[in-house]
Amino acid sequence: MDLLLLFVSSIFIHNILLSRFLGCCPFMGVSTKLETARGMGLAVVFVIMLSSLMTWLVYHYVLVPLHLEYLYTLSFILVIAALVQFVELALKKLNPGLYKSLGIFLPLITTNCAVLGVAVINMNENYTLAQSLVNALGSSLGFPLAITLMAGIRERLDQNDAIPKCLRGLPLALVTAGLMSIAFMGFSGMVK
């Protein structure tokens, strides 16, 4: 598969949040403020890229030669957990404000199904290392794109006094996410 096509399709057509519906917990939880959404998006980009590289290497150079392919889920989770710990320590030291604003969602990247999902998609599609990294880059860039758009929309909606009180917060966020998902479905005709 052409790498550019894979890159573009993983951002827009197969968007990890709005098409594959992976990583919805941080999508709803962190998208209330634009700054927090950007920070979470960057952390997820970093973790998805590194975890895709590491899980591809573990799968092809450890699990397959030892005929332990059935342990891929457990080994992928262990790799992701170690990487998230690294990101958490780095953020705590380099940007304490962002570390505090992400709160519980930072350790939850360990169980973010988007991170594990990209690694599993790379394995299931039998991508080469280059294809896996391109898919990981596109998927990981699609995550902050979606979460930043959502945060911007939610901030604007929170400032609107005409919205009924019963729709404010999560109900309107769910409707907004659905509309965003439908909008991203419009990209599906780009690739046959």
Regions found by a protein language model. Give the residues of each.
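Generic transmembrane alpha-helix signature in multi-pass membrane proteins
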Residues: F21-G29, E88-L94, I104-L108, C113-N126
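Cytoplasmic-side transmembrane-helix entry/capping segments in multi-pass membrane proteins
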Residues: E35-F46, Y70-F76, L98-I109, K165-P171
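Interfacial loop-to-transmembrane junctions
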Residues: E155-L174
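Hydrophobic core segments of alpha-helical transmembrane domains in multi-pass membrane transport
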Residues: L6, V44, M49-L53, I77-E88, ...
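Helix-coil boundary and interhelical linker segments in multi-pass alpha-helical membrane proteins
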Residues: M1-L5, L57-Y70, V120-L133, G189-K192
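Ordered, amphipathic secondary-structure segments that act as subunit-interaction surfaces
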Residues: H60-G103
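Juxtamembrane transmembrane-helix termini in multi-pass membrane transport proteins
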Residues: V8-A43
